[in-house]
């Protein structure tokens, strides 16, 4: 998939953009969901382990799911992936491994470039999480542009920040 194709799909979602990920990818997914929600794209985070305990009901046929996993093999995401495939809910995969389970099951796949984690022993998610966050922020900003989200719209979702910024404009 191309970045533009993913933006097109997300811009036309009739429901919400659901983000999911486990561990460090889950923290990144939460941040991306928060950025999207505060910039005009209805988005929420669903924890993949909680999904199998009833939270799958948070995902509707009008939604699209962005699943984040560096390896693409996060076992806790199996139930949420099975659910969205069963009900033909669009699945966008963000992973470093196109040939992974997630990469193969995604309707659209955005593959992160090859990288080495910045951690001295090369294991702690550092480079991968930074790249994923940058990609998620880029999606949110592209959706802002696509939807014509304005400074005034921003003020509606950020009344305290917006009032403070307006007070300090020259």
Predicted regions and their residues:
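Glycine-rich phosphate-binding loops that contact phosphosugars or nucleotide phosphates
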Residues: 11, 16-22, 26-134, 140-143
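Conserved small/polar residues in nucleotide/adenosyl-binding loops
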Residues: 163-170
């Amino acid at each position: 998939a191309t970045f533009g194709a993913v933006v097109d799909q997300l811009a036309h979602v009739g429901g919400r953009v659901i983000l999911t990920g486990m561990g460090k990818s889950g923290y990144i997914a939460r941040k991306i969901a928060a950025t999207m929600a505060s910039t005009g794209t209805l988005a929420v985070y669903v924890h993949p382990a909680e999904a199998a305990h009833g939270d799958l009901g948070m995902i509707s046929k009008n939604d699209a799911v962005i699943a984040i996993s560096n390896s693409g093999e996060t076992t806790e995401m199996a139930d949420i992936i099975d659910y969205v495939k069963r009900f033909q809910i669009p699945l966008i995969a963000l992973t470093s491994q196109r040939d992974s389970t997630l990469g193969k099951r995604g309707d659209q796949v955005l593959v992160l470039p090859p990288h080495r984690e910045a951690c001295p022993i090369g294991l702690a998610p550092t480079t991968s999480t930074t790249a994923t966050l940058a990609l998620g922020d880029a999606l949110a900003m592209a959706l802002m542009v696509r939807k014509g989200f304005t400074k005034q719209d921003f003020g509606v979702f950020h009344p305290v920040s917006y009032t403070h910024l307006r007070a300090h404009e020259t």
